[in-house]
Amino acid sequence: MKVAVVLIVVLVVMMIGQETDSWRIRIRRGRKIFRKIRPYIPFVIGAVGKRQAGDAEFQAKYNAAAEDGVFTDEEIKSVFGVDDNGFVEFKATYDVDGDGVVQVEEYETVVELTENLAG
């Protein structure tokens, strides 16, 4: 019985050793691959770039609608381009206090929280 326990302990130690060795190989391979593609990363980022939150036309419409601090139903439909079904979902998502009016502050808070949760 003691011999069996010793053999099991030895096998477990050997298995752990094999697992760490296999992780080391994977990490080393990952480092080699990263070293090969690292010089090209700035070119890819420069070509694709980080997408802006919106284009100039959207930004102009948004700023005009946000001047009074409240998005009216017509402003929501024209600025965000939602139809009647999307309008109901938009109100349900961005009307935080449930008063039937989407305020700019509510909209920006929900967008910021969503971006933070998305990463």
UniProtKB/Swiss-Prot annotation:
The keyword Oxidoreductase does not apply. GO terms for molecular function: metal ion binding. Component of the acid-soluble organic matrix of calcified layers of the shell (at protein level). InterPro entries: EF_Hand_1_Ca_BS. It is found in: Secreted. The keyword Cell membrane does not apply. Residues 1-22 form the signal peptide. Its main location: secreted. It comes from the Eukaryota. GO terms for cellular component: extracellular region. Ca(2+) binds at D95, D97, D99, E106. Residues 82-117 form the EF-hand domain. Disulfide bonds: none annotated. Keywords: Calcium, Metal-binding, Secreted, Signal. This is EF-hand calcium-binding domain-containing protein 2.
